[in-house]
């Protein structure tokens, strides 16, 4: 007779994991899900195994809003090794080209402004983007190159941190869809020496604070030594995933109507339009909705807590 499946928990919130180097995002996602005994979990944009840093993991109803974190700005600190290009544009790849590095800090500072603002970036072949249903990295591992279209990205800030040849360290504030490996590869070509990512750490996703992260070893220790209620204390509320949207409080009647999936007329004195966070009179998070041009609240994604 098959052993009955262990029942998980309907636990809801966002856990800010400081992802360790060497583990894939999906691997740590499954570990965190198991530590919390959660029925449902999802991450908000993969980090390469080489990379460390912030990986928000959504549990339960928070998974409904993971796309909004995926679409949010990110901050990284990256150390590039100049003079070497690899096939993956990071330290885990095969060396494909070596060049002499004879750059000064002044040379680098003169180039950096060309990599800020609205740019077009061609994604690396070693990415999870799909072609005919298969990730590009699977083609790359078979030495097959697929033509990729350049995609619009925004580098809000590219801050010089240090340069001790051949290592250059930068802080990057960027839009969704930015490949730091590609950015460094492109920068290396512009500098005339080539480059690849040696160290990569994600500092922030959206406006989540770095000091709210917990490292994997600490979480694992808690899961082995403490009750689940202790782990639950480290979950951030579901609505933090959509904190960038304005907050709207509904009356009891409006809350009931929204609960039935109905559109509700809204006395829009503040003239707020677009996506908003909805709350009950008791300040309970209900979900997100769109306020239309004719002042109607149209439910988008509602929670079931």
From Swiss-Prot:
The gene it comes from is: truB
One MF term in the entry's GO annotations: RNA binding
Origin organism is Haemophilus ducreyi (strain 35000HP / ATCC 700724)
GO BP: mRNA pseudouridine synthesis; tRNA pseudouridine synthesis
Name it: tRNA pseudouridine synthase B
Q: Which CDD domains match?
A: PseudoU_synth_EcTruB (cd02573), PUA_TruB_bacterial (cd21152)
**Record-linked Gene3D superfamilies:** Pseudouridine synthase, PUA domain
The UniProt catalytic activity note for this protein reads: uridine(55) in tRNA = pseudouridine(55) in tRNA
Q: What does the record give as EC number?
A: 5.4.99.25
Q: Which UniProt keywords apply?
A: Isomerase, tRNA processing
Q: Where is the active site?
A: 48
């Amino acid at each position: 007779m098959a052993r009955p499946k262990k029942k998980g928990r309907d636990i809801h919130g966002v856990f800010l994991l400081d992802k360790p180097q060497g583990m894939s995002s999906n691997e740590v996602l499954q570990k965190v899900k198991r530590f919390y005994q959660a029925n449902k979990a999802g991450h908000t944009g993969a980090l390469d195994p080489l990379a460390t840093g912030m990986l928000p993991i959504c549990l339960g109803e928070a998974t409904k809003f993971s796309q909004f974190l995926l679409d949010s700005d990110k901050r990284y600190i990256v150390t590039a090794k100049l003079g070497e290009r690899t096939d993956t544009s990071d330290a885990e790849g095969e060396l494909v080209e070596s060049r002499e590095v004879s750059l000064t800090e002044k040379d680098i500072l003169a180039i950096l402004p060309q990599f800020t603002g609205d740019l077009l970036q061609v994604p690396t072949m070693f990415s999870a983007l799909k072609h005919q249903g298969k990730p590009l990295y699977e083609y790359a591992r078979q030495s097959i190159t697929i033509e990729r279209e350049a995609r619009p990205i925004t580098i809000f800030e590219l801050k010089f941190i240090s340069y001790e040849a051949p290592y250059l360290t930068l802080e990057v504030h960027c839009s969704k869809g930015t490949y730091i490996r590609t950015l460094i590869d492109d920068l290396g070509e512009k500098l005339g020496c080539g480059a690849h990512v040696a160290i990569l750490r994600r500092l922030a996703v959206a406006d989540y604070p770095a000091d709210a992260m917990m490292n994997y070893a600490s979480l694992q220790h808690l899961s082995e030594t403490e009750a689940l209620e202790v782990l639950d204390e480290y979950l951030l509320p579901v609505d933090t995933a959509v904190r960038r949207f304005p907050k709207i409080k509904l009356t009891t009647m409006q809350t009931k109507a929204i609960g039935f999936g109905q559109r509700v007329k809204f006395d829009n004195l503040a003239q707020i339009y677009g996506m908003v966070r909805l709350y009950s009179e008791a300040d309970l998070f209900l979900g997100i909705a769109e306020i239309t041009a004719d002042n109607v609240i149209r439910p988008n994604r509602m929670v079931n807590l």
